[in-house]
Amino acid sequence: MLWPYARSRNKIYFLDMKKLSLILLIICLFNNYVNAQNNVQEPYPKLTIGLEWGYIVSLNSIYHYNFYAPEGFRVDEKGSRWGFTSNADMYLNVGCNLNPEWNISLYIGYAGVGDYHKILPISLRGTRYFGTDPMQDRWFAFADAGSGICLKTPVQEILTAKIGAGYEMSLSKDTKLNFIVAARSTYTHPGIQFDDHRIPMKNTNRNNAIVSALSFGLGLTF
């Protein structure tokens, strides 16, 4: 049986905490400046920034692999795997409240995909709030889609899509705490393991997989 997997062999160096803190500070200051320019009667901030954390449960992977085995023959395999794999994700978002009921935001983050590899996704999300008073707790629904890269050798592009809903607690005019549930799908490109051999990309014609998952998260917007 063919069991695919992906392991990143290159170390990915991210911004250190000082640089990240500086970026967040600049965004916060800009957020405060823009919101201060709003009319004093405006019941909600125009510019929003936030952080989001989540727990991901991957349930299914539909895959199609086409490659040359170490012995030289060609292998074409399609299938679907069911299982339970847990991961986590984290996002930074910057957005705009179009009105009290609609928000559009750009999300940049880091997430795991099944038992394959990690990804760096970037997506655009539209959120619909049910209730016109931003100072009150309310329900919401959202959908987002985007692209990104998978952190493996070689790096390949991925596609993501997500729909979900949640409940927003209003802590203040500018600060909201969100409880989120979502269904998500990721189109990615795992590495391939065949008979204890890792198949190099030069011998790989196709390494596609669609991973379906559920996620449960918390978000803080201000």
Language model feature labels by segment:
Residues 91-164, 169-177:
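Gram-negative (and chloroplast) outer-membrane scaffold detector with strong preference
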Residues 156-216, 222:
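A generic hydrophobic-segment detector
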Residues 1-45:
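Cleavable N-terminal export/targeting peptides
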Residues 36-96, 211-222:
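Short glycine/proline- and aromatic-enriched beta-strand/turn motifs that initiate or cap beta-hairpins
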